[in-house]
Swiss-Prot record:
<feature type="short sequence motif" description="VHIID">
    <location>
        <begin position="316"/>
        <end position="320"/>
    </location>
</feature>
<dbReference type="GO" id="GO:0009740">
    <property type="term" value="P:gibberellic acid mediated signaling pathway"/>
</dbReference>
<feature type="region of interest" description="SAW">
    <location>
        <begin position="511"/>
        <end position="587"/>
    </location>
</feature>
<feature type="region of interest" description="VHIID">
    <location>
        <begin position="285"/>
        <end position="350"/>
    </location>
</feature>
<comment type="similarity">
    <text>Belongs to the GRAS family. DELLA subfamily.</text>
</comment>
<dbReference type="GO" id="GO:2000033">
    <property type="term" value="P:regulation of seed dormancy process"/>
</dbReference>
<keyword id="KW-0804">Transcription</keyword>
<dbReference type="GO" id="GO:0045944">
    <property type="term" value="P:positive regulation of transcription by RNA polymerase II"/>
</dbReference>
<feature type="short sequence motif" description="LxCxE motif; degenerate">
    <location>
        <begin position="221"/>
        <end position="225"/>
    </location>
</feature>
<feature type="compositionally biased region" description="Low complexity">
    <location>
        <begin position="15"/>
        <end position="30"/>
    </location>
</feature>
<dbReference type="Pfam" id="PF12041">
    <property type="entry name" value="DELLA"/>
</dbReference>
<keyword id="KW-0539">Nucleus</keyword>
<comment type="function">
    <text>Probable transcriptional regulator that acts as a repressor of the gibberellin (GA) signaling pathway. Probably acts by participating in large multiprotein complexes that repress transcription of GA-inducible genes. Upon GA application, it is degraded by the proteasome, allowing the GA signaling pathway. Together with DELLA2, required to enable arbuscule development during arbuscular mycorrhizal (AM) symbiosis with AM fungi (e.g. Glomus versiforme) via the regulation of RAM1 which, in turn, regulates various AM genes (e.g. NSP1, NSP2, PT4, LEC5, RAM2, EXO70I, STR and RAD1).</text>
</comment>
<dbReference type="GO" id="GO:0009938">
    <property type="term" value="P:negative regulation of gibberellic acid mediated signaling pathway"/>
</dbReference>
<comment type="subunit">
    <text>May be a homodimer.</text>
</comment>
<feature type="short sequence motif" description="DELLA motif">
    <location>
        <begin position="61"/>
        <end position="65"/>
    </location>
</feature>
<dbReference type="GO" id="GO:0016036">
    <property type="term" value="P:cellular response to phosphate starvation"/>
</dbReference>
Length: 594
């Protein structure tokens, strides 16, 4: 199957596992035009590739095959020789012509690299087509090179598909590119002097990670398409190819592609039940808190809205739909302790899932918070509720007391209710019966709840690529400063555990369906619609919260790539141009809250 693919050619660096071959192919960049030297190099190539042929049996080169190029091991000597000839032919043209060629001309996909190079040589230099096997005509190597750079040579590039390669060249152009280079007297030779690095604009064929990255993304999308079309045989072949392409990448791209490959494999081969308990999930959550500003931003912006809503109240009650390790509340307690006129009585209701070992983790968190409250002089009361789903909560269980100001807080919790129809509506009805002064919601800014698998996969790929990029960028700065605020782990350990934390989400979004797919993130626009339908009104997060959130990011290592954006009274945190999480605040209309 042929496809159009734009490439830039002029020299080549092609690597495989044979170091001798790699060094030889790299020599195509500096070509000696002395006859004896050319003969010796060609003989060396012949011997090297003859041995390669005997070793590999003339099969396809595995590394180049993984990158999409079909080159038999027995043909690689010819490919190397022809790439040298191709560079010399194209080098005789004007620099402007080559630039024009690389940018305005469409070259067809050179998956069959041997035939493609031969075709290019034929089109650029018809005389070279008469030499089918360079290794069989060793005596004419010098003649070939000399003819290639004949001052009177003219090559018609109009045969290449696309626009004319370059305007008619002036005479004696090639002669201007030749000069004598002083060598030891024993080996006099006339060679082409390589131009200075800053002036070398000739395109070079490289097996680089950028091209492989494009192939990787296309293969990921093709695999998702095959799964949606239930072509599991094709999907299985593609997912194996994804793993190979991912191994050729570095940094965030390699990591995120590997997690998506694992998720696709789970969907193809089945989903063995995961046995990771909630305590381990909370450990991953804490490492994610340390390695990035996302949870810090979520806690800060929600606390600011709650603090403003509690202004003047003598008794306050916070209901946290996902207490976890209680990391959000020390900052709020300290802010309440500094309130003019003295701190209010602070009551906290924490909700969490059951533990695998049946330990009372919520009470342990409550005890630590009680110790802090005693230290800073805040009257504190804690109660924990263990439940499998916040949809199971009943308003009477929460024991709302007369005269206390109530706030409901949900950070990355409500989207899990979307797996069961009607659960979100039930939770919001419960909240309305509680009659809080404010409801704070933090959710991922992504749409991973659509009905079409490919659309969901595409959105997730873009979203988590940005998240992994931000982790990579911020933690490189953290490693340089070698700082860690809590002592939970080194920056590298926090990064690794955070990647596992996000990898679990990727797996759930891609591999699971039905009630098992709980990572059903929706956008701020979608949550606005849901909250409005449930009878809530938006609360504008003030400019003070925006300024303080921006200051928080400025203090965070690697914060240059993060940005805070105000969106119709809500605050969003993103990485460069992509918004990733959103904080919103809500209240009931005045006539309902009375």
């Amino acid at each position: 199957m042929k496809r159009e693919h734009q490439e830039s050619f002029g020299g080549g660096v092609i690597s495989n596992n044979n170091k001798t071959n790699t060094n030889h192919l790299n020599s195509s960049k500096n070509i000696n035009f002395g006859e004896c030297s050319s003969m010796q190099n060609t003989n060396t190539k012949q011997n090297m590739w003859r041995e390669e042929k005997e070793t590999n049996g003339g099969g396809m080169d595995e590394l180049l095959a993984a990158l999409g190029y079909k080159v038999r091991s027995s043909d690689m000597a010819d490919v190397a020789q022809k790439l040298e000839q191709l560079e010399m032919v194209m080098g005789s043209a004007q620099e402007e012509g080559i630039n024009h060629l690389s940018s305005d001309t469409v070259h067809y996909d050179p998956t069959d690299l041997y035939s493609w190079v031969q075709t290019m040589l034929t089109e650029l230099n018809p005389d070279s087509s008469q030499i089918n096997d360079p290794l069989a005509s060793l005596g004419s190597s010098s003649e070939i090179l000399n003819n290639t750079f004949n001052d009177d040579s003219e090559y018609d590039l109009s045969a290449i598909p696309g626009m004319a390669a370059y305007p008619p060249q002036e005479e004696n152009t090639a002669a201007k590119r030749m000069k004598t280079w002083s060598e030891p007297e024993s080996e006099p030779a006339v060679v082409m002097s390589p131009p200075p690095a800053v002036e070398n604009t000739r395109p070079v064929v490289l097996v680089d990670t950028q091209e492989t990255g494009v192939r990787l993304v296309h293969t990921l999308m093709a695999c998702a398409e095959a799964i949606q079309q239930k072509n599991l045989k094709l999907a299985e072949a593609l997912v194996k190819h994804i793993s190979l392409l991912a191994s050729l990448q570095t940094g965030a791209m390699r990591k995120v592609a590997s997690y998506f490959a694992q998720a696709l494999a789970r969907r193809i081969y089945g989903n063995p039940e995961e046995t990771i308990d909630s305590s381990f999930s909370e450990i991953l959550h804490m490492h994610f808190y340390e390695s990035s500003p996302y949870l810090k931003f979520a806690h800060f912006t929600a606390n600011q809205a709650i603090l403003e809503a509690f202004a003047g109240a003598g008794r306050v009650h916070v209901i946290d739909f996902g207490l976890k390790q209680g990391m959000q509340w020390p900052a709020l307690m300290q802010a309440l302790a500094l309130r003019p006129g003295g701190p209010p009585t602070f009551r906290l209701t924490g909700i969490g899932p059951p533990q695998a070992d049946n330990t009372d983790a919520l009470q342990q968190v409550g005890w630590k918070l009680a110790q802090l409250a005693q230290t800073i002089g805040v009257q504190f009361e804690f109660r924990g509720f263990v439940c499998n789903s916040i949809a199971d909560l009943d308003p009477n269980m929460l024991e709302i007391r007369p005269g206390e100001a109530v706030a409901v807080n949900s950070v990355f919790e409500l989207h899990t209710m979307l797996a069961r129809p009607g659960s979100v509506e039930k939770v919001l009805n419960t909240v309305k019966k509680i009659n809080p002064k404010i409801v704070t919601i933090v959710e991922q800014e992504a749409n991973h709840n659509g009905p079409v698998f490919v659309d969901r996969f595409t959105e997730a790929l873009h979203y988590y690529s940005s998240l992994f990029d931000s982790l990579e960028g911020s933690n490189s700065s953290s490693n340089n400063s070698n700082s860690n605020s809590t002592g939970l782990g080194s920056p590298s350990q926090d990064l690794l555990m955070s990647e596992i934390y996000l990898g679990k989400q990727i797996c759930n979004v891609v591999a699971y369906e039905g009630v098992d797919r709980v990572e059903r993130h929706e956008t701020l626009t979608q949550w606005r619609s849901r909250m409005g339908s449930a009878g809530f009104e938006p609360v504008h997060l003030g400019s003070n919260a925006f300024k303080q959130a921006s200051t928080l990011l400025a203090l965070f290592a690697g914060g240059d790539g993060y940005r805070v954006e105000e969106n119709n009274g809500c605050l969003m945190l993103g990485w460069h141009t992509r918004s990733l999480i959103a904080t919103s605040a809500w209240k009931l209309p005045q006539n309902e809250s009375k």
